């Protein structure tokens, strides 16, 4: 228990700072906002609140609120641990679902881009750019699509967390306040989405990587189209990195909960889960800070060179 608390004390504050870094820079710089980075922004919000669970866990530990147990009964659960368990389930699912929507987004945009390249329609060929009515229509389409993503993610998380709460299944667990009982069937409300999202994300990533390896930019395309295709490719790779981080950092939690359900010794995975899940937000912030778009923007802010036409520099922006 003390080892877990120590891990939370080290990892959680760093990860929360990482999430805030993404949130603040996204809000400050319009050039970082596009149809893909919207997903990164909302995942960062989910990460921030989910990681704050670990700060609350530390506080509960030092004020002696029970939250670590392998008991299967939830009859003695205090309201504080119950509330933290519900909070954790909601934002944990939000982190998972926003990661999954990134997978869907990059898969859809990649094959949408392939169709546009085949038609060689340069004028309407950008994700968030263009001109005149095409730009306005495209932005309206993006806004409507994002609304559906919001409805899916937040609606799913609310229903998922509420059903478990109504059934009074939140309480102390091996890693803090969550769903009580290692072999509690209600844990499949967490495991099934994890199994599904991790499996489909791996399959989609492999398919896209194979396609990207086979596809080669055409030197016959106009300069602007070539630059756009390169930038679009860079941004898809960035989104894929976020998806890969989700797979890597949530895999230990998936293995842990699966082993717990079957009653297998899992001390190593308890500690690994504490490290990986609490550090996911930090890993996301590192990908965000090292992206070509962010680095170019920061370079221009620091060097302060005028007339660099940032509107044309990143054509994939809205």
Swiss-Prot record:
GO terms for biological process: adenylate cyclase-activating G protein-coupled receptor signaling pathway; cell surface receptor signaling pathway. It is a multi-pass membrane protein. Pfam families: Dicty_CAR. Residues 25-38, 105-145, 209-234, 289-318 are cytoplasmic. Disulfide bonds join 81-177. Keywords: Disulfide bond, G-protein coupled receptor, Membrane, Receptor, Transducer, Transmembrane, Transmembrane helix. GO terms for molecular function: G protein-coupled receptor activity. The chain crosses the membrane at residues 4-24, 39-59, 84-104, 146-166, 188-208, 235-255, 268-288. Residues 1-3, 60-83, 167-187, 256-267 are extracellular. It comes from the Eukaryota. The keyword Lipid biosynthesis does not apply. It is found in: Membrane. One of its GO terms (cellular component) is plasma membrane. Receptor for cAMP. Belongs to the G-protein coupled receptor 5 family. This is Cyclic AMP receptor-like protein F. It comes from Dictyostelium discoideum.
């Amino acid at each position: 228990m003390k080892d877990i608390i120590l891990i939370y004390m080290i990892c959680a504050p760093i990860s929360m700072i990482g999430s805030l870094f993404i949130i603040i820079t996204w809000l400050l710089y319009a050039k970082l906002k596009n149809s893909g980075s919207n997903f990164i922004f909302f995942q960062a919000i989910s990460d921030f609140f989910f990681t704050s669970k670990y700060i609350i866990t530390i506080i509960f530990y030092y004020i002696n609120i029970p939250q670590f147990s392998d008991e299967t009964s939830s009859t003695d659960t205090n309201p504080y641990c119950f509330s933290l368990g519900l909070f954790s389930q909601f934002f944990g699912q939000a982190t998972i679902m926003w990661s999954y929507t990134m997978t869907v987004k990059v898969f859809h945009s990649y094959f949408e881009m392939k169709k546009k390249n085949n038609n060689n329609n340069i004028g309407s060929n950008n994700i968030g750019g263009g001109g005149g009515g095409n730009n306005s229509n495209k932005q309206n389409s993006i806004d409507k699509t994002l609304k559906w993503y919001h409805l899916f993610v937040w609606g799913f998380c609310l229903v998922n967390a509420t059903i478990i709460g109504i059934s009074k299944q939140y309480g102390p667990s091996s890693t803090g306040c969550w769903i009580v009982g290692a072999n509690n069937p209600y844990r499949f409300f967490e495991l099934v989405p994890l199994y599904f999202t991790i499996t489909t994300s791996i399959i989609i990533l492999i398919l896209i990587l194979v396609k990207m390896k086979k596809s080669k930019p055409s030197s016959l395309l106009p300069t602007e189209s070539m630059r756009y295709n390169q930038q679009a490719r860079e941004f898809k790779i960035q989104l894929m990195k976020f998806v890969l981080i989700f797979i890597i950092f949530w895999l230990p939690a998936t293995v842990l909960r699966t082993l717990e359900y079957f009653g297998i010794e899992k001390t190593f995975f308890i500690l690994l889960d504490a490290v990986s899940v609490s550090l996911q937000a930090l890993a996301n912030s590192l990908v965000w800070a090292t992206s070509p778009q962010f680095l170019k923007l920061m370079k221009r802010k620091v060097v302060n060179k005028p007339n660099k036409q940032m509107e044309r520099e990143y054509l994939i922006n809205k």
